[in-house]
């Protein structure tokens, strides 16, 4: 998926403009104070430099001509100079302190915006982007903005103010020497622009390569057991070396160009200083221009102040270019198009009055209905949530040009248990993903209690579904917190009841801290079966009318499977259930079994009916070949 600003925002100047606008929008007062402090700091530096002329011509030179020198005027002048520089130091401290706060605050806001937008992205986005690369945006890319905001931006602003004010002062002192200085600064700016353009594309590559390294490390950490089982440590290391070497090359290319910018400009600045000293010395000695010693010394100081900002800007170029590469990736994530949701039907709590009419209520009644805001009258506004699910001629493909489900037709009445069986890749899990609207179909309709699910708000649709995914995901926190994740307002007693229903209560109580046992690393301190039981308990506490069990017992041992199955049978009672299992014994009691092959339903019926037909289901169940 491409974001709406992908092409436009690759321009570094537009990225910088957007970032500056973002900072000013959120920190108007702080930015104003920073500009004032930088302005005062730059002017105090300039005043100090110009004061040197008066110090030499009006105080030091007259002292050399006095028989009895009076140093008190000189001392007073020096005190004024110290006061000027003290104000500059305080202002420098002030704007640096403020910019640190602005930088950290901006990074916090951007991380929050990225995370908020990321949570609204469709599942398809995460299918096509490496998780480690996304993590790199939150860490490496966002960190490139820290130095830009807290150091580079104020430094560049300070340098620009110094450059302009110094230029005006130089013109006042001596125009010929100013021309020499301007020519040398123009050369410095030309060199800086060429070198920064050359290094810019390498910094973009560097940030991408950092993301690839992070993605590979994250993948290897998740698959470390598989790596060790197949003894592929050396192969993994070699592959990492290739990715890491590519990062080294892009970083080396970027930094070797950026790092020579400052030395080159520094030497050009020194040449400018020497030329001004030579030309100024000749003019002063000839008496042609009326240059005094104080004016020449002051101008040479101004020359340093004129070339130094360009050198300082060139020093910040690498940080700015790298930050723009990072900012591009940050704004790319912020600009990713969220999951579309055009539904308007809501899931609401209801109660019945004495006349048997439905009324919406804020109380938790455990009775739910679909609310249609555009209904013609009140009788049609509410549809009781029952769990009736129908597929009518559904076609779907993860890519529009490659359909993986063909003309799927089925219905599940409230309380029925439907099972999907078939070989790997037949499309079983895909069907459950469509019920959740993790993906939208290409053709056909899916109806929930007679309502097209495209008309139901996605959040409300998903709240009505309980899900046990193929991969059990647990979060850092206590066991109680993980069970309560199914319904955040559930009480401890309700969570414990759900655990008992899932037959998880027994092993939980045997843990040292029981329900307060802290899980870390996705529940790595629990067995696979225990994690599966907690996932089932989490679905149970949500108390949904429809359950989706994707390979719920495919990864646990036979003994635990029997334990889970008893809990699941109790949980599925009275609920519409969609079950996917490779172990066909777990779905024998299903009301209807759908046999899938290459995205089509090729057989359907009860276990006994399908066994009598001796078709594909019979082959899967018995392991026997179908006789011709």
Language-model features, listed with the residues they occupy:
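ABC-type nucleotide-binding domain
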Residues: 67-68, 350-628
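An intracellular "coupling" helix at the cytosolic face of ABC transporter transmembrane type-1 domains
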Residues: 25-28, 123-124, 142-149, 153, ...
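Membrane-integrated ABC transporters
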Residues: 1-45, 60-79, 95-99, 103, ...
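Juxtamembrane helix-loop junctions of ABC transporter transmembrane domains
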Residues: 6-12, 36, 44-60, 84-131, ...
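Alpha-helical segments in transporter systems
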Residues: 29-54, 77, 81, 95-100, ...
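Helix-loop-helix
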Residues: 62, 169-183, 253, 257-328, ...
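Transmembrane helices of ABC transporter permease
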Residues: 26, 30-40, 84, 90, ...
């Amino acid at each position: 998926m491409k974001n709406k600003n992908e092409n436009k925002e690759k321009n570094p100047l537009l990225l910088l403009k957007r970032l500056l606008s973002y900072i000013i929008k959120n920190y108007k007062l702080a930015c104003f104070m920073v500009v004032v402090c930088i302005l005062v700091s730059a002017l105090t530096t300039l005043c100090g430099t110009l004061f040197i002329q008066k110090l030499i011509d009006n105080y030091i030179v007259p002292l050399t001509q006095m028989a009895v020198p009076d140093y008190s005027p000189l001392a007073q002048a020096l005190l004024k100079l110290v006061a000027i520089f003290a104000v500059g130091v305080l202002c420098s401290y002030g704007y640096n302190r403020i910019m640190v706060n602005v930088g950290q605050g901006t990074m916090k806001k951007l991380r929050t915006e990225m995370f908020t937008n990321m949570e609204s992205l469709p599942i398809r986005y995460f299918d096509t982007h490496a998780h480690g690369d996304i993590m790199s945006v939150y860490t490496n890319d966002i960190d490139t903005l820290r130095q830009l905001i807290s150091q580079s931006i104020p430094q560049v602003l300070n340098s620009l103010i110094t450059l302009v004010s110094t230029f005006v002062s130089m013109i006042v002192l001596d125009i010929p020497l100013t021309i020499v200085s301007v020519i040398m600064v123009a050369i410095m700016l030309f060199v800086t622009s060429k070198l920064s353009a050359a290094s810019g594309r390498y910094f973009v590559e560097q940030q991408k390569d950092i993301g690839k390294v992070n993605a590979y490390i994250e993948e290897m950490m998740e698959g470390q057991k598989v790596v060790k089982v197949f003894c592929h440590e050396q192969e993994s290391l070699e592959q990492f070396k290739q990715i890491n070497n590519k990062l080294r090359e892009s970083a080396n290319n970027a930094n070797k160009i950026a790092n020579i910018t400052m030395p080159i400009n520094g030497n050009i600045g020194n040449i400018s200083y020497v030329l001004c000293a030579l030309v100024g010395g000749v003019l002063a000695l000839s008496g042609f221009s009326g240059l005094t010693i104080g004016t020449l010394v002051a101008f040479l100081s101004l020359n340093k102040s004129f070339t130094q900002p360009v050198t300082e800007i060139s020093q910040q170029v690498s940080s700015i270019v790298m930050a723009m590469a990072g900012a591009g990736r940050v704004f790319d994530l912020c600009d990713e198009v969220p999951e579309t949701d055009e539904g308007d039907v809501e899931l609401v709590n209801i109660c019945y009055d004495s006349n048997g009419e439905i009324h919406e209520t804020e109380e938790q009644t455990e009775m739910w209905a679909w609310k249609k805001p555009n209904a013609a009258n009140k009788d049609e506004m509410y549809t009781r949530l029952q769990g009736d699910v129908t597929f009518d001629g559904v076609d779907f493909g993860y890519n529009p040009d490659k359909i993986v489900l063909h003309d799927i037709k089925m219905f599940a009445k409230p309380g029925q248990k439907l099972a999907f069986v078939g070989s790997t890749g037949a499309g079983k899990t895909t069907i459950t993903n469509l019920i959740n609207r993790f993906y939208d179909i290409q053709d056909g309709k899916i109806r929930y209690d007679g309502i097209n699910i495209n008309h139901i708000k996605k959040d409300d649709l998903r709240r009505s579904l309980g899900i046990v995914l193929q991969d059990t995901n647990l979060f850092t926190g206590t066991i109680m917190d993980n069970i309560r994740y199914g319904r955040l307002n559930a009480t401890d007693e309700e969570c414990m009841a759900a655990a008992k229903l899932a037959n998880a209560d027994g092993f939980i109580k045997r843990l040292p801290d029981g329900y307060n046992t802290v899980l870390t690393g996705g529940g790595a301190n629990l067995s696979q079966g225990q994690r599966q039981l907690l996932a089932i308990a989490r679905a149970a506490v949500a108390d949904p009318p429809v359950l989706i069990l994707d390979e719920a017992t495919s990864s646990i041992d036979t003994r635990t499977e029997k334990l889970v199955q008893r809990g699941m049978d109790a949980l599925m009672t009275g609920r519409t259930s969609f079950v996917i299992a490779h172990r066909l014994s777990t779905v024998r009691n299903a009301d209807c079994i759908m046999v899938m092959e290459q995205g089509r339903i090729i057989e359907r019926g009860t276990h006994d009916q399908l066994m009598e037909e001796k078709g594909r289901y019979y082959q899967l169940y018995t392991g026997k070949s179908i006789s011709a």
